[in-house]
Each structure stands twice: as structure tokens, then as C-alpha cells.
């Protein structure tokens, strides 16, 4: 299990946690988000559960409850924290307990947890303040484990998205052309920032990176259903979104009406020290 480089992270790119409007825009269609976004590999869930000292889990950026339901099915009790009331309301309807707040501002009121998780949402959290809050609420030996889906999109789909966005929304923060590189490597600056934030607290073991490879075949309809849930696309007006979907649909048609997307789900993880440095 590799540890993460302690070299200086690449700070040249934007800081996602500062883009609050985008971070809190996913609830515009919470039902679509929950339907279209893929769950996490069962092996990822099982490993985090096995590596945690108990079953009490805090889910940061719980969204509609996708990963919370998976951890509940694995025997955990899960409390979600979610800044978007619309997403939280959907999660509650699926049986997930959720409190509405930005994690950095959330009040734990003395509650402690065995694991703090975050499913493709930790990049919306300040990496230092978030790690410090996690240290506050984790029991000694508890596990901090934010994880992210990293899709390796086919070049044809990237090209169609890039062209469409340059035409209809040149200022969009979503830049699919960056994904032409090996996807996991393209995400390393983000993962390095997460790890550096954990280190800065002085409250955790050296961060590790766990990787889980899998793939999913999307039909044309499934892929076009998921695209509007991507950050940076959630705020497009309907007419511009229609243009993006037309372009994306044409690309899928050229691929035979479906697209196979390899994923690597990456966990950045560390355990809460028994004493702070």
C-alpha cells in the first residue's frame, strides 16, 4: 500500500473548496444524481470497515446517501453531513440521517466516530480545516478515509465534451481535456493536497493511497443521464446543456451506442494518532 509523496503539492490549479456555488449546486436534480452516479466498489467499503476500530461512521458531503447506504449495508451506523438541503432531503428519504452544514462549520457536540469518510466530495472541503475537524471527532485509532472515483474517459467522449463546452460555456470550471492524461496521475495534485492537509494537523499517521480498479459499461441513455451531474455542468442553462448532450450523444453513437469507462476508486487514508504531535 503506497504512501503519498511528501513533496510540495501542485498548487497551481484552482482550489475546489472555494467554489461554493458549484459545490452546492448538485441538488438541482438530486434524484438524477442518485440515479446516475455509480456506487463504490464493495472491496473499498469492506476494507475501510475492516480497518476501522468500530462501526460508527461520519460521512462528509453525504450527498444523496450513495456511500452512506453502502456502509450501512456493511453493518455501520452512519451520520451524514451535507451542505445542500436538497441533497440531504433526498438522503433522509432513503433512510440516511443527515445534518445540513459545511463540514468545516458543523458542530459535533462531543460526538465521536470510528471513521470519517467522504465519497468524491472531500475536494469541496478545505483540506487543512477538514482534516483538523476529522481529528476532532475521530476516536484514537479511528480512520480518516476520503475516497474519489477517477474515471478514464475515452478520448472520443473527452473531445466532444471539450468542443461543446468551449462553444457554449467557455468559462466553465469543468475542463474535460485535462482527463486526456492518465486519469489517476491527473488527479495526483488533488490527492497530494488532501494528504498534505492531513499531515499539517499533526494528528494522523502518514497518509496512504488505496486503489480499486473496476469498469462500467454505460448505454447512451445512462451516460447522458450522468453528464448533467458533473460539477461545472450542473449550472448550465437548459439550452446550453442540450447542446452539450447532443454532442456527447453523437460521440456515443460513433462508439456503437455505449461506452466502457474504466475507473480507479482511490482512498486517501490515515489513522488518528493517540496523541497529537
Language model: regions and residue ranges:
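Conserved Class I S-adenosyl-L-methionine
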Residues: 3, 184-277
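A short SAM/SAH-binding and catalytic strip from SAM-dependent methyltransferases
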Residues: 114-128
